[in-house]
Amino acid sequence: MSEQKKKYDMNSPEAKALMEEITHGTFMKEGTMVAFPTCFPGASIPIVADESHITALDATPEGIIYGGTSGHRSHVFVAMFHGATGMVFDLMAIEGATDCAAVCCGKEEVLACVNGWQDGGRIVATKLQPLPYDCIQEWGFERPSFQDYGPAFRGETIIHAVAEPASDTVIGITSGHLFSADPASSRIETLGEVPGSGRIARTASGSIVGLDGDSHLWSYAPRTRSLRRRAYVLPDGNWGKAPLLWARERQTGLLYTADGEGGLFSFDEGKGFSRPLGRTALKPVGPMAVTFDGRVFGFCGPELAKMFCYDPAAGQVSNLGVALSVIEHRRYGYVFGDAVTGRDGQIIFGENDNLGHLWLYFPKIKSAGQGRPDRPPHVL
């Protein structure tokens, strides 16, 4: 005798709550997303679909965004969203380049690290763009010339790079070496050997850290030009399953990262890694950034990523759903390549997909009294 199927009461509070979660909890449960095309709407056309996977972002102190794309060709673009601007301008399509690993804003120039050549990933640079007078009344940009610094290390792919403001240089890694690029001299210098894996980050003191095997971080101090291998021990977790990613809190320099299982941690040079802060709904953890009140926003999961928020004041990780923009035109966001914090605390995500957009996320404003702690608890 077959077992009788259990009947569900679709009018029960439990069933209604589940239906509500499925219906209204799949997409953007908190805050507002705006998907912005890679153009000046109404005045120019976006970067073509198979060249517009946004994989690298950075921002100047004034809040001007620079980015790089991957695909059939790599492009470098500038984006402005404050004042009377509201546009993305394609600065250059780089012939031969198919992958942009990083863009780094210096005091006067932006450097892009691009791959696609047999002799190794190269660095190209151009002057920063000034804030235009008024993009409503008049709009005039010229595509600037780019200078090619050459390969970062001959025969090796560039993995990632970050700006080092104190010396106005760029520190990066290839598949086997640590290097610096100096805009003042247009020179690239090899600083040592490191395993080229995942992304690197700048700490509160200005040191650069990156993954050193599956159990440690290496550390490079630009001021003393000293490289320490196996400088910091990683906490318990799965650190070889997904590329290492970071988010940096601008005010304190506190870093956030995640292991391959979606476990979140913070890192402070003096105190080491925190205890586990929480776990994301999906894995692996993708790009993330920290807004001004200390909350961390990012994406997790492959192909159909969901947004998450870690709130240090509440000490919890929440699932915010799949990215959806409903302002002016409807667009769903599934895969993202990088993230950066904007001038006013909004988070800007680069969509790593055909016809990629810049997604501006405006977090929910906290209620009065919902303060933020100075630092998350750390293991001493």
Language-model segments: which ranges?
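Repeated scaffold domains used in trafficking and secretory/extracellular systems
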Residues: 51-57, 96-104, 148, 154-162, ...
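A short helix->beta-strand "capping" segment at the edge of beta-propeller domains
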Residues: 22-50, 143-147
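Conserved beta-propeller blade signature
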Residues: 65-67, 110-113, 169-172, 207-210, ...
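Beta-strand-rich domains and repeat architectures in extracellular enzymes and scaffolds
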Residues: 43-74
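Beta-propeller fold detector
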Residues: 37, 87-93, 134-150, 189-193, ...
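Short glycine/acidic-enriched loop and turn motifs that connect beta-strands
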Residues: 72-74, 116-120, 215-216, 262-263, ...
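Blade-level signature of beta-propeller repeat domains, shared across WD40, Kelch, NHL, RCC1
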Residues: 332-380
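Short loop/turn segments that connect beta-strands within beta-propeller blades
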Residues: 80-84, 128-131, 182-186, 221-225, ...
